[in-house]
Swiss-Prot record:
Molecular functions (GO terms): 4 iron, 4 sulfur cluster binding; 4-hydroxy-3-methylbut-2-enyl diphosphate reductase activity; metal ion binding
Entry's cofactor comment: Binds 1 [4Fe-4S] cluster per subunit.
Pfam families: LYTB
UniProt keyword annotations, A-Z: 4Fe-4S, Iron, Iron-sulfur, Isoprene biosynthesis, Metal-binding, Oxidoreductase
Protein family per UniProt: Belongs to the IspH family.
Binding site for (2E)-4-hydroxy-3-methylbut-2-enyl diphosphate: 43, 81, 131, 170, 226, 228, 271
Annotated protein name in UniProt: 4-hydroxy-3-methylbut-2-enyl diphosphate reductase
Organism of origin: Anoxybacillus flavithermus (strain DSM 21510 / WK1)
Residue sites binding dimethylallyl diphosphate per the record: 43, 81, 131, 226, 228, 271
Active site: 133
Amino acid sequence: MEVIKITPRGYCYGVVDAMVIARNAALNPTLPRPIYILGMIVHNKHVTDAFEEEGIITLDGPNRLEILENIDHGTVIFTAHGVSPEVKQRAREKGLVTIDATCPDVTKTHDLIREKVENGYEVIYIGKKGHPEPEGAIGVAPHAVHLIETPEDVEQLDIQSKRIIVTNQTTMSQWDVAHIMEKVKEKYPHVEMHREICLATQVRQEAVAEQAKEADVTIVVGDPRSNNSNRLAQVSEEIAGTKAYRVSDVTEIDIEWIKDAKKVAVTAGASTPTPITKEVIDFLEQFDPNNPETWKRERKVPLTKILPKVKKRGE
């Protein structure tokens, strides 16, 4: 079996920055305890488990403001997905120390929404309903931001303003965004289009679109809650034409998927730890469909190998 290691794949700079910020917080004895992360720092359970080992508590739920109400003291880290101004204000009111690990690309979208709304615009925002990134973006101007997810949602919009922009969640499929934006343009010909797919998402999707064409099957290593991981699987199937499966780690690979494959492509979401992906690649490279001894799937990566290294204070 040939393993096609799609490149680029895996960690993006926004994810690495967020994890380094959180690790530095864990190593800083001057910060009030406990230290909480408001939601999953990035959408990968291996990462949140590793932070739990470092004494950082992940509090997850569908609404950041509601989660915050459960915290009365200590330090709060805002995740890479961003939070609304209301969440930041409430944290200040509660006297909490806050650390912002928002991805710069997400901040850029928040700034765009803020600026346009101040100038009288209505904002159509293409994003995944229930995902924390749209939650934060909508929170910038709840009265003026309209969340849509599908072309069908465009038909339900009823915006009378002459000033409209359309923008999007940074981790969406660029092909989906382009298609939905065209639908918006048909309905509102005067709309301003601001595509905000982050570069890391874009190049990873394009790599899958091109490099997965040669494969019989694609394995995407990523958490089920990772939107960008799910979009990579979608791109493999819809753009490259190659059947794709998303797995959290090597233990989730089904032998039926790969036993007849001559070529298997592997990629990973932007929040997937590199050692977890390497374990998948190593398994596939030694796999022999005729030798059941090579079928054993066992995750051996320790949590201590999941997070990026940072220098301890004083080093």
